Each structure stands twice: as C-alpha cells, then as structure tokens.
Swiss-Prot record:
Positions annotated to bind [2Fe-2S] cluster: 122, 195
Superkingdom as given in the UniProt entry: Bacteria
Designated gene of the protein: ilvD
Full protein name: Dihydroxy-acid dehydratase
Catalyzed reactions: (2R)-2,3-dihydroxy-3-methylbutanoate = 3-methyl-2-oxobutanoate + H2O; (2R,3R)-2,3-dihydroxy-3-methylpentanoate = (S)-3-methyl-2-oxopentanoate + H2O
Length: 616
C-alpha cells in the first residue's frame, strides 16, 4: 500500500519544524492525516486566457477541503504567445514550457504533495503541466479556463466572426482602411478565455480530454459560461476520491500514466488529426509521451495521419466555425463519437471519472445520449458581452448542431476530407520529418514546386514579404529558428499572416525549422527535423534551389543530387566554430535562452531536453 507522500512532512517528532510551518499556513491537528492536494494555478493579468483564473483555484480548494483533503495553491508563469509574437519575446514561449514543468515538479516534490488539480489554459501552460503530471505520476485532474467567445462585427452589411488572426491580417493589409482595421481589432477578442479558434491552447485542452485527464466539456465549454463552474467544483471533489483510491486502496488506475496510456495518446492524436488541430500539439504530445515513458513517436503520428479523415473544420481553417460552435455540435466527445463509429479509436481506455470510452460516449455523445442535462450543457453558448469574468453569463443555443452531414462536426461519410487535418512529410532535408496543417491548405496547392527564398531569421523574412521581395510561386525558407537555433523555436504567425495580407496566401509556401501558431493556415510547413543548428540539410538550401512539396504523397524534396548536397555540407563544416550557425543574423540571446539551447533537441523529439547530455 503506497504511503501518503505528505506524511513525510506531517508525521514524526523530527518533522516538528515542518508541522510548525504548516500550522502557519492555517493547518490544524486534524489536517495532519489528510491528503495534501496541490492546486496548480496559472492566473496572470498578462494573458486573456488566464486573467479570470484568480478565484477559480479557491473554488477548487473549497471542494477539496469539503471532501476531506487539504488544498494548497501555487501559481506557474504563463506566456501569451499572441502578445509575445513578432518580436524577441517569442524566443521565450517554448522554453517556458520546460520551466512550467520543472516549477510544478519543484513545488510538488519540495512540499511532498499527494495529488494535483491543474488549472491551465493557454499555449505552453497546459503542455508544461501535462509534462509535469506524467513525470510525477501522482493523481491529477486538469480543468482549463475555457475558450474565448468568437469576436463579431459588421462589415459590408454582414455580421462576421473574428479572432486574433483577423486583426493581425487586416492590420498588415495595406488595402484595409485604418477605420476597418481598428474596428476588427476592437472586436476580435471580446472576452476572457483562450483564443476562439482551434489554435494551440484549445487544441491542447481538447487533447487532455481525449487523454482522459480532464472532464467531458473541458475542451469546448466557454470561459464565460456559468456551466463551466461545475467543472471546477467537480474537479475538487473528484481529485480527493482519486487520491484516496490510490493511497488507501492501492488502485494504480488512478494514476495519470495508467489513464494516459499509449492507447490514449493514439486516441488524442487521432482526435487532433480529425479536428485539424494546431501543429504545436504534435510537439507537445511527443514531449508528454517521453515524460510518461511511452514509445510514441513521429512514426506513430504519420501512420495515424494516413488513415484518419478530417471531421471538423474550425478557425483558422474557416471563419464559419469557432470553439463555441464545436461545443454546440457536441465538443470533443462529438468528434470522438464519429471516430468511434468509424472504428478509429482504442476503446480500452478510461478517464478521470473512471468511465471507459464507450461509457463516456454513451453518456456524453449528443447523437446518442438520453441525458437531458448533458444536452443542456452542450447548448451553452456565447452572450456577446465584453467581459473578463468567468461564469458571467448563462446564454444557450436554441438547439444543438447534430447535423453530421453539413454541420460543424461531420460523420465519416460526410468528412471534410478523406485525409486528416495534419500530415507528416519526409524528404532529403526533413529526414526525421516535418509537419503541415493540411486543414488550412487550399486544395489547389497540395502539390507545389517553386524556387527557394532563404532567410536566416523570421525578422528578415517578414521584411522581405512586406517589402515585396517574395512573389507568387516562391518557397520561403526560414531557418535557424528551431529549438536550438532560435533558440526557442519561434512561431511564424506573422510571416504567414503577412503572406495573406500581401495576397500570397495561396500562391507561396513557407518552410521552417521553427513552428507555427495554431492560428496559422496556408501551405506552412514547420518542425523540419533535424533543424539547421543541429546539422540539418535545411541549412544547405540556397536561394533559387527548387523545392517540391507533395502533401498527398507525404513528400518534401530539395531537388539537388546527393553529390551537390554533400559538397555543401563539406563547405558548411569548413566554417569551423561557425558551422551550422546563421551568417548574418543580429540577435541578442540571453544566458537563460543559451542554457535552454544547450540541451534542446529537434522538433521530432518534442523539443525536450537531451537527457544524454546530463549524464547519470
């Protein structure tokens, strides 16, 4: 029978000092036999996805205390990728994932907490907490802050839906008037919550649901809606049950590594492909799998991408649907229900509620459930009122979207495309693979061949795009922006947005060893591995080289013979200490980022730290 970890600090005369300190936090004698549950919050006023979380930790803590546990809350950092975008701040985004994972480990292990409730929401916070949870392998439940309502405004006598990406594109489009750009900017992000499309934050919160580590509705129920409060209340109660099951009944099924099994990871990736999620999810799932010591690799993702269709299409791939529409159509479990009927899921998995996947679908799939409370929950809709307050409205759709032929979520028969929303490409400069969000690629450019325009930083590429130096038919190559080379693997949302604003969204390709925002669409290929700074062949591409992209056949090729590539590699190596570094880039890199770069692996490994360099 496992012993409560917290007993290390609460029992025995030699822990009198620790108990004295616990008492100073408000604990009493009656608390020193109860499980100590860490409430891992991420409130900050910097991030709209986290600005409303201040009081939500208290909600969870009250339920933990009422259920027989002791709640202790702490906070992690949280970077807003949208605000950090387009300047040096983006270098810090991906490295913050590792800091978040480490900080959770440090706090939980230093104070011997028995379990966790993770209150996350945005891009690197959910992945960082997920990595920590699987590293620590103690009972955990995730409950995120929820999606933002979609922005709405009237343009040309028509009400349209908006999000952050629209504001960026219109702001950079010289054909858009100042008045219209200002109108879109003021309407794009109306409430608290994670940005309203199927961007990285919402993708990851959907995936924690598919992994079984969060409750039904977690990925899609709006941040502003009163129904979301119940997820927080339930999490506080349920975590105490899970904790006691493990420590008092020796039930290892309560542990995250037994819930988020390899089968669950495969289900999560299947969901991601079917819903056209952010390419960043590939990076984060690979990293989380390594923390769980699960053999889940790019090869597994490639196999799934070849058989899973696209059943859901959401912004930024279309402006017709946002997360509020996904929720109305049944949310994550609506998509999983269709995947299950198509025979594409592993059913031998459970979630934090203790339900198997078939049991969960029976209760929560809106096309089959008889539970009126569930149907009511999925009718939770937007209010259209600007607010930073959680649970501030109780509006509902008049009806559910259960149209699987022409609605937001489709059945296999009526899939948006036979191929899923993500694909892994391989070739002679992406030997370990690269990722493209096919959900955002126009059919006319699924096959594309053109001359390379090579840039050794995102900044240089943006300057060239806005300066008219990139023209129709070009393949923009941005390198030395990988985990090691950036360092930090910047998102390339500005280059892709500016290609659109210059009218080149369907006329050019963009390839990088960096990554893309979940808001990216177009022929944008990222995560090229190995990256340039690790000796990847992408470092050898020159202006004018022909690059051929063939998404249907999962191929990407630099059209040079092996002898020429070998000669260029030899010339690169001859640069000595300067080999595999950018030639003319002016970038100040802090000590903290250099430390990150010294251990960073390429994207095909999830950009995690290279443990082989640590010894032991």
């Amino acid at each position: 029978m496992p012993k409560y970890r917290s007993a290390t600090t609460t029992h025995g005369r030699n822990m009198a000092g620790a108990r004295a300190l616990w008492r100073a936090t408000g604990m009493t004698d009656s608390d020193f036999g109860k499980p100590i549950i860490a409430v891992v919050n991420s409130f900050t006023q910097f991030v709209p996805g986290h600005v409303h979380l201040r009081d939500l930790g208290k909600l969870v803590a009250e339920q933990i205390e009422a259920s027989g546990g002791v709640a202790k809350e702490f906070n992690t950092i949280a970077v807003d990728d949208g605000i950090a975008m387009g300047h040096g701040g983006m270098l810090y985004s991906l490295p913050s994932r590792e800091l978040i994972a480490d900080s959770v480990e440090y706090m939980v292990n230093a104070h011997c907490a028995d379990a966790m409730v993770c209150i996350s929401n945005c891009d690197k916070i959910t992945p960082g907490m997920l990595m920590a949870s699987l590293r620590l392998n103690i009972p955990v439940i995730f409950v995120s802050g929820g999606p933002m309502e979609a922005g709405k405004t009237k343009l040309s006598d028509k009400i349209i839906k908006l999000d952050l990406v629209d504001a960026m594109i219109q702001g950079a489009d010289p054909k858009v008037s100042d008045d219209q750009s200002n109108q879109v900017e003021r309407s794009a992000c109306p409430t608290c919550g994670s940005c309203s499309g199927m961007f990285t934050a919402n993708s990851m919160n959907c995936l924690t649901e598919a992994l079984g580590l969060s409750q039904p509705g977690n990925g899609s129920l709006l941040a502003t809606h009163a129904d979301r409060k119940q997820l927080f209340l339930n999490a506080g109660k349920r975590i105490v049950e899970l904790t006691k099951r493990y420590y008092e009944q020796n039930d290892e099924s309560a542990l995250p590594r037994n819930i988020a099994s390899k089968a669950a990871f495969e289900n999560a990736m299947t969901l991601d492909i079917a819903m056209g999620g952010s390419t960043n999810t590939v990076l984060h799932l690979l990293a989380a799998a390594q923390e769980a010591e699960i053999d889940f690799t790019m090869s597994d993702i490639d196999k799934l991408s070849r058989k899973v269709p696209q059943l859901c299409k959401v912004a930024p791939s279309t402006q017709k649907y946002h997360m509020e529409d996904v929720h109305r159509a049944g949310g994550v479990l609506g998509i999983l229900g269709e995947l299950d009927r198509a025979g594409l899921l592993n059913c031998n998995v459970k979630n934090v509620l203790g339900l198997t996947l078939p049991q969960t679908l029976e209760q929560y799939d809106i096309t089959v459930t008889q539970d009126e409370a569930v149907k009511k929950m999925f009718r939770a809709g937007p209010a259209g009122i600007r607010t930073t307050q959680a649970f501030s409205q109780d509006c509902r759709w008049d009806s559910l979207d259960d149209d699987r032929a022409a609605g937001c979520i489709r059945s296999l028969e009526y899939a948006y495309s036979k191929d899923g929303g993500l694909a892994v490409l391989y070739g002679n400069f992406a030997e370990n693979g690269c990722i493209v969000k096919t959900a955002g690629v126009d059919d006319s450019i699924l096959k594309f061949t053109g001359p390379a325009k090579v840039y050794e930083s995102q900044d240089d590429a943006v300057e060239a795009i806005l300066g008219g130096k990139v023209v129709e038919g070009d393949v923009v190559v941005i390198r030395y922006e990988g985990p090691k080379g950036g360092p930090g693997m910047q998102e390339m949302l500005y280059p892709t947005s500016f290609l659109k604003s210059m009218g080149l969204g369907k006329a050019c390709a963009l390839i990088t060893d960096g990554r893309f925002s979940g808001g990216t669409s177009g022929l944008s290929i990222g995560h090229v591995s190995p990256e340039a700074a690790s000796g990847g062949t992408i470092a050898l591409i020159e202006d004018g080289d022909t690059i051929a992209i063939d998404i249907p056949n999962r191929s990407i090729q630099l059209q040079l013979n092996e002898a020429e590539i070998a000669a260029r590699r030899e010339a690169q190596e001859a640069r000595g200490d300067k080999a595999w570094t950018p030639k003319n880039r002016q970038r100040q890199v802090s000590f903290a980022l250099r430390a990150y770069a010294s251990l960073a692996t390429s994207a095909d490994k999830g950009a995690v730290r290279d443990k082989s360099k640590l010894g032991g």
